[in-house]
Regions:
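Positively charged, helix-rich recognition surfaces that bind polyanionic ligands
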Residues: 1-167
Length: 167
């Protein structure tokens, strides 16, 4: 019988392989990963959740993914991700960087776990945050424009179901 740690590593390895193969098949040459310094420090999500969450080896996860991507010719970049979960991507809210220098009101909010409500639409909160991380990266590289925004809004408004089989 496999240990839980080995089983988790096997699932992660298969997930990485699937992700890297998908990126290659779609001709994606840059993977943007959000980072937030000290994000696992001093969290307060309950004693049991703190123990479970802070035990997840995200640094190891990120390094392994970066290694496999770079092996496949995909550049991996890290993007500071403060305020990406609070800002509405669909409403094109500005995204301040940490520490926030001015008061900004955001047009949307998390309505419940996993959902973000903008002015007119509801979107998965993780998708909203991910799109904002990408937006921050593109803005910092002077590559953000209205065409990219409208394309991404169209893509995230028509989700696809992906099934991954683990043998």
């Amino acid at each position: 019988m496999k240990s839980s740690k080995n089983n988790n590593n096997e699932v992660l390895d298969l997930s990485f392989k699937y992700l890297v193969n998908y990126l290659v098949s779609q001709s994606i040459d840059v993977l943007v990963i959000g980072t937030n310094a000290g994000w696992k420090q001093n969290i307060n999500i309950g004693k049991r959740n703190n123990q479970n969450f802070t035990n997840i080896p995200f640094y190891k996860f990120k390094n392994k993914l970066a290694y496999l991507c770079e092996e496949a010719g995909i550049e991996v970049v890290e993007q500071e991700e403060s305020y990406t979960s609070k800002s509405s991507f669909l409403d094109n809210d500005p995204i301040p960087t940490h520490p926030k220098s001015v008061n900004i009101s955001f047009s949307g909010e998390r309505t419940c776990r996993g959902l973000y409500k903008s002015k007119n639409k509801t979107i998965n909160a993780d998708v909203n945050g991910s799109l904002n991380i990408l937006k921050k990266y593109l803005i910092s590289n002077a590559a953000w424009n209205g065409n990219i925004f409208s394309d991404l809004v169209e893509v995230c408004s028509t989700p696809r179901k992906v099934t991954v089989c683990f043998d």
